[in-house]
C-alpha cells in the first residue's frame, strides 16, 4: 500500500534508534505553536522533532532563531507536499484533528496527540479517535513531556495505538466513493467509450 505502513509493521524508531515526533498545524501552521514545541522539548525520551509550519512564516522564523536552544534535534519545514510520507516515518503526530490530517494519520498508522481541538469537526474527530485508541487528547501543552515520554518508552502501547489508527484508516476511500457513485448512474446515462 502506498500510503499506509502496512498492517504487520510496528512503529519503528527513525534512523539511529531515534523516534520522530511530527508537529503540524494545518496548511497555515496555526495549530503548531512555539509554546507547544517548547513543552515537547522537555520530554526526556530520545527523539527528533519534525515541525511543519505550513505558510506560517512567523513561527518558522521563531523556530529557526531559537533552534540551538532546544535539547532535541529539530527539522523545521514550511509548506510541504509529502505529508503522507512524513507521517509514515513518524512515531507520533502532534496536531489538529481536521478531516484530512486525521484521515492521513489513520492511513499511515500514526498515533496522534491532540491539543485544544476547536469546537465542531475537530472535537468530533478527537472523540472518535480517542474512543478507538488511536489518539490521546491533552488539554494543556505542559502535559506533553510526560505523555510523550510515556509513549516513546512504552513501544507496546505505541504499537497498539498505531494498529488502532491503521484499523480506522481507509486507504482506498476515494476509489470506493467513486465506485459507489458510478454504481448509481443508470447505464443509459453512462458516457459511451
Regions found by a protein language model. Name each.
Residues 1-53, 58-193:
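Nucleotide-activated sugar donor-binding and catalytic core shared by glycosyltransferases
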Amino acid at each position: 500500500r502506498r500510503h499506509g505502513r502496512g498492517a504487520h509493521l510496528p512503529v519503528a524508531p527513525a534512523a539511529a534508534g531515534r523516534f520522530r515526533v511530527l508537529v503540524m498545524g494545518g496548511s497555515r501552521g496555526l495549530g503548531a505553536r512555539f509554546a507547544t514545541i517548547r513543552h515537547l522539548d522537555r520530554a526526556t525520551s530520545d527523539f527528533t522533532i519534525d515541525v511543519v509550519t505550513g505558510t506560517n512564516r512567523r513561527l518558522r522564523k521563531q523556530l529557526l532563531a531559537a533552534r540551538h536552544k532546544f535539547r532535541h534535534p529539530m527539522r523545521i519545514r514550511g509548506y510541504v507536499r509529502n505529508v503522507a510520507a512524513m507521517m509514515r516515518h513518524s512515531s507520533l503526530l502532534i496536531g489538529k484533528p481536521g478531516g484530512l490530517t486525521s484521515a492521513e494519520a489513520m492511513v499511515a498508522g500514526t498515533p496522534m496527540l491532540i491539543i485544544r481541538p476547536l469546537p465542531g469537526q475537530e472535537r468530533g474527530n478527537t472523540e472518535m479517535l480517542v474512543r478507538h485508541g488511536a489518539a490521546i487528547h491533552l488539554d494543556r501543552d505542559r502535559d506533553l513531556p510526560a505523555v510523550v515520554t510515556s509513549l516513546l518508552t512504552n513501544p507496546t502501547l505505541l504499537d497498539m495505538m498505531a494498529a488502532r489508527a491503521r484499523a480506522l484508516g481507509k486507504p482506498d476511500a476515494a476509489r470506493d466513493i467513486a465506485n459507489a457513485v458510478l454504481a448509481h448512474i443508470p447505464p443509459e446515462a453512462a458516457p459511451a467509450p
